[in-house]
Regions:
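Short, charged, surface-exposed hinge/linker loops at domain edges
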Residues: 1-7, 12, 37-75
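Short aromatic-glycine-(Arg/Gly/Cys) micro-motifs in beta-strand/loop hairpins
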Residues: 12-26
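A short, exposed loop/beta-hairpin motif centered on an aromatic-Gly-Thr core
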Residues: 27-37
Length: 75
């Protein structure tokens, strides 16, 4: 069964950089990097691995960087 997950991204600026992701299914996820570009580059593999650990297979992932939103379809 296919279902969609919407994740809001909040960028927190600091020495290490930080992305905080929130959704109904995923209370929070924090990804640290040296720059905002690095954080966004790492977003796809980190989310795929996390969802795989949870037992969901990612079918599509759309990362809307300007809108600070990630949409994931899983089965």
């Amino acid at each position: 069964m296919l279902r969609s997950i919407g994740i809001d991204i909040v960028i927190v600026r600091g020495n290490a950089g930080l992305v905080h992701a929130r959704s109904r299914q995923m209370r929070s996820l924090m990804v640290m990097g040296r720059s905002e570009d690095e954080l966004w580059r790492d977003m796809d593999p980190v989310l795929r691995d996390l969802l795989d650990i949870e037992g969901d297979k990612v079918t599509t992932m759309t990362i809307d960087r300007p809108g600070r939103r990630v949409r994931v379809d899983v089965e």
